[in-house]
């Protein structure tokens, strides 16, 4: 056996017979000087090593432990409140914005002079929620005691006040005092304004003049004039406003939406009275009667003459939606008509003096037509307009690009030409500069998860230039607006850094000044353990799918973290972006050491129409495959605890999270420990007609797609996993009926579920207190699910069963 002699326990072998000592018997003299030099050298080397370690260690690592973790309280605190100045251009050089302290300011870009139009204390004294300045800057319109109706719509009281210190004057219809209005807003000129009361439209030529009722056919809850009903607000126009001023203010286009044949839905109110009450409203479900719509134009100078714009004479348009209205000139209005199946659209230019509409462009799809409510941009004479349409770009299908349509004098034919092309999307056209022959737009040309501001020449070579690339630090996701002559632009950086707003010269991109830096939010972020964000791609069949991973700030490869998959997946949506966000997911990562992953799979937007429309008539099926591939990719990482994996989704994402929860892993074992769904869609025949029919076809013609996508077919496998369902009982978008139907199936399948309800609350949780409670509930559920104690690794459990 080999033995090793330690330095402190020397083993000495005595000399045997016949062996001679090779050294003398006198002990050697020690070299004390050499030893001292050696020790000094060692000390110098050690000090150099220590110094190097200190210098090379990142400062953030040494200070990380001193930083606070993000909490639920942070989400709703002033420290984390992003201030949006809501800047709006009103001329070639001037814009109006609201400063952080509340005052409304007029600022001149060239002189850098600022004028206070409205003191913040005046807004506070009126308890005003919204304000709007008249075009002549003489008056301000305030709204207060505002109550939400649906996602965008609201009712409230309105007052007018002369700038800067005038007394407030109530805005009311002639026949009613102290009226709660559905809408009020200025026109494009002077002090002209309209307001809507009981679905009728009233017009004031200027402040002080009595309002006149110009549209009188309204019927509360049934016939809407100038406003959207529920379906148009939520799914079609995506706005509560359904009226449009001509540029010169002489005419008003408005939609009349008739819900008289649409079935009624009743939302119960359980609290506040001995017997529950109900709120009825018209809600078209898949296959039921839809609202009818017509577009009218009224003249505002002289006698009001009401003229209806004629829809296309096309058999495919027997039932249609109006998805976009935009004035081209003071007498021409552009309208997009979309058939109920949402696979044929016709863009027309209507004469506001005759009602005759001329077809300018037609689009058709074998699946569905996406992005149908986007407005074209017109030249001043209306002969040329720019619009976004899907153009084939090779194997990845179609991408959305700018097309220009030019009409020639004395000719019925228009010239169509593409301005942009490539495997990326134009996400929005912003402005057209006729003087410089440039079009300004946002696009994903850099990366699908980014948004940058570009310009393109509209003549000759169509050369493009990125205006926002490398313009502002830590800013890759932007939006923008231009002054009236396009000499200046406001750049709103929305991420990945803390949002900022800056003002730039268009010619040389020079930054003129910072309008909002959100410095307090930046300080709060710097003081917190914010998640590390990583981006990856996974290969699924013929697609390369983007993935976003949020890791704790203190992440190390040697630890084991629970994994949460967050799904949205609404067709055309995007989860993986570089926008700045601080949400309950941030809290789960920062305070509770979870890893969160998101993946934009088939059905998501901004990666071509081929990937987008793969999910047609089979919602859930392909999304499950892609999301599970993202989970499998993460489970290959050593730092992920395979016994603590969860999934969460909201709305359509709630449908997907419930669909995915029973999914099996590669060894046919359960992948997910738990899951949660907030306001889940569970049966598409119970959901809004425009949404369900867009992706599954018209209900009643072929219902197989509706039957196949029911969650009832999936939840029978939910036995062991913890499952939390959260739903508001007065949800006007996804009715509690969805959850009730799901629970019936869960009980039959003996599933382990929990239900949390919010009595009498709407879909959008307008109350801050309820939003905070909701965040705590979701976080608390996953923290409990991820607890390590009493958890037995799956492999160990199986081995013990085999031994028994």
From Swiss-Prot:
Compartments where located: Cell membrane
BP term (GO), one: regulation of potassium ion transport
Gene disruption: observed consequences: Knockdown animals obtained using siRNA technology have smaller brains than their wild-type littermates. Performance on the standard Morris water maze indicated spatial memory defects and learning disabilities.
Keywords: Cell membrane, Disulfide bond, Glycoprotein, Membrane, Signal-anchor, Transmembrane, Transmembrane helix
Residues on Cytoplasmic side: 1-34
PTM text: N-glycosylated.
Annotated Gene3D superfamilies: alpha/beta hydrolase (3.40.50.1820), Dipeptidylpeptidase IV, N-terminal domain (2.140.10.30)
Tissue: Detected in brain cortex (at protein level).
Disulfide bridge positions per record: 350-357, 466-469, 475-493, 674-785
Record flagged with keyword DNA repair: no
Statement: the UniProt record of this protein carries the keyword Disulfide bond: yes
Gene Ontology CC terms: membrane; plasma membrane; synapse; voltage-gated potassium channel complex
TM regions (residue ranges): 35-55
Family: Belongs to the peptidase S9B family.
Protein name per its UniProtKB record: A-type potassium channel modulatory protein DPP6
Gene, per the UniProt record: Dpp6
